[in-house]
Amino acid sequence: MPGFDNWPDTAKGGSSVVCFDLRSGSLKQRFAAPEGAQWGDMTLDAQGNPIVSDGQSGAIFQLRAGTWHRLDHGDFISPQTIALGRDGKTLIIPDYVRGLAVLEISTGEVSWISNSPTLPCALNGIDGVYAAGDRLFITQNGVDPERVVKLQLDKEGRSILGYTIIERATPILGEPTHGVRVGGDFYFIANSGWDALDRHGKIRPGARMTPPVLMRYSEKPKGTSPL
């Protein structure tokens, strides 16, 4: 990662997607990124193929049959953690600067999800998006205060009808980053520690690292709780 200097030079200069055997923990395969690519976040398509974003160049790549294929046409500035659309043919891409987009996997065509005219929600600073039918769970660490939000979409999945704040400005919430949907619950990293680091990956003067906290949000019954 550019700017981070707390690891050896031999570990710099390349990105890879690696596959491990979950039972043994052994490394099965490694797929090096194209030259110059800097992978940031990953999801899987309907066939289990990795799809990765490059937050530095704005590119979106898909791995098929051992070969990387670029999906986008240069629409993004800083794409983050992507979600697979409910049709399996589209991707929901959070751009840290521009907002939420829908990308057609087969063509690379992009359309931007429109905001609610009556209850608009800030869509910048989204670090990750996680789909659940007609709802999107987002972690936003590029807004002040940082927050975790549930968005309600229309039936086409192209417009936001409303939103619910899951966690914002609470003592337990630091800088939220990644999450995952399991059954009817949304689990997310509530305090990743990124806010305590400077641009070089070192602890900022006066900052203090705290133990990581995972949180769970349940829609039925509604509410969050630390794990």
Region annotations inferred by a language model:
Residues 26-32, 67-73, 109-121, 161-169:
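A short beta-strand motif characteristic of beta-propeller blades
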Residues 2-5, 55-57, 95-96, 141-143, ...:
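Short loop/turn segments immediately following the C-termini of beta-strands
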Residues 1-13, 81, 191-211:
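Short, conserved, GDST-rich strand-edge loop motifs in beta-rich repeat architectures
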Residues 9-49, 53:
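Asp-box/WD-like beta-propeller blade repeats and closely related beta-sheet repeat scaffolds
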Residues 12-23, 150-154, 202-222:
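Beta-propeller blade signature
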Residues 7-8, 17, 58-61, 99-101, ...:
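Structural signal for beta-propeller blades
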